Amino acid sequence: MTVDRQALGFGYGEHAAYASNPWASRGRLYPEASSPTRSDFQRDRDRIVHTTAFRRLKHKTQVFIAADGDHYRTRLTHTIEVAQIARALARALKLDEDLAEGVALVHDFGHTPFGHTGEDALHEVLEPYGGFDHNAQSLRIVTKLERRYAEFDGLNLTWESLEGLVKHNGPLMTADGQGLRGPVPQPILDYCALHDLELASFASLEAQVAAIADDIAYNTHDIDDGLRAGYLTFEMLEEIPFLARLMREVHDRYPGLESSRFTHEIMRRQITAMVEDVIAVAQKRLGEVRPESAKDVRCAGRVMATFSDEMSETDRQIKNLLMTRIYRHPEVMRVRQGAASIVTDLYRAFMDDPSLMKEHYWIDQIAGMAEPARARHVGDYLAGMTDTFAISVHRRLFDHTPDLR
């Protein structure tokens, strides 16, 4: 019996001409039969959600390492918020929502324990062997390190999902093969030798909305978490004209509103304003370029989903506020220093004695490896750790573990 795809709610008739077509995917590295009940992009999204890497995001830091209280964001809650915004943008622009959501859900898979602090520490110890890049690590996870399926390593995602993962922040190299932001990480080059992700072009519009959704989400929720932690005040927010205007709107409409509700009303207005700004810019640029296919978007030579000049300035001001008031706060810096030492200590311990990893797969795999491969293997193990697991292992192996609270 033939399944009516539109009757299943895939809604391809609602897609714009420039949207990625789930029925015309460029395929998977290992060919698979299509599902009669789900599009290829739906299957990608579902595979991503069922991974151990996705579950581990629950115990990985967003900003506040080992924070007291259950209301601060983690990588998982951040990822879910990004996916919601990406899906809303995709619907407004008549894109494939499943592809946009999938890219949003997978974009942080490669993050280490302790956020960017852990990544910096791991990059430093791995620098002699090519360093560490969380985006390249995300690709390694979904193409190699997740071991779930009988016929292949990784998730065997479609070309479009992998392209979106690797290029959601823009092209990685020039047409003549030069890296645009430094050397292209070797894991990305290695995969492209098997399955060319066309690193010199832009990604699909679905991937672009996932990228800008990431900016919108963390700009908003880092303010929320900063207020909750006491690192930010409403007076500090008033220094930014955009936020000052939102605060006046809320105050005028709801005078005397309690602090938590006041904060929420500001945040929801901030998200709405930023989303509407991106939609307006994307519609304008699409009207100028008039792409007739997803390929036309990739070859347009510029990003389609981005902020206006005015909102870009607001974005810059918010990032500067977050950097000076939160990310470089003395207490945050103290905790970051301790977190970095945990990652460095564990790396050295595992390199000296791999049996300390205590997991047979990782120990067995490292036997006989040359030092560069051994270092990358230990890096993979460390990158997969959650904050809580890294702390507990450090306590088992060392007499003193830094207090991260």
Swiss-Prot record:
Family indicated by similarity: Belongs to the dGTPase family. Type 2 subfamily.
Disulphide connectivity of cysteines: none
HAMAP family found in the cross-reference section: dGTPase_type2
PROSITE patterns per record: HD
Gene3D superfamilies associated with the record: Hypothetical protein af1432
HD domain segment(s): 75-219
One term of GO molecular function: triphosphoric monoester hydrolase activity
The protein's name: Deoxyguanosinetriphosphate triphosphohydrolase-like protein
Keyword Transferase listed: no
Keyword Flavoprotein applies: no
Pfam families hit by this protein: HD, HD_assoc
Keyword terms: Hydrolase
InterPro entries the record matches: dGTPase, Diverse_Catalytic_Enzymes, dNTPase_2, HD/PDEase_dom, HD_domain, PHydrolase_assoc_dom
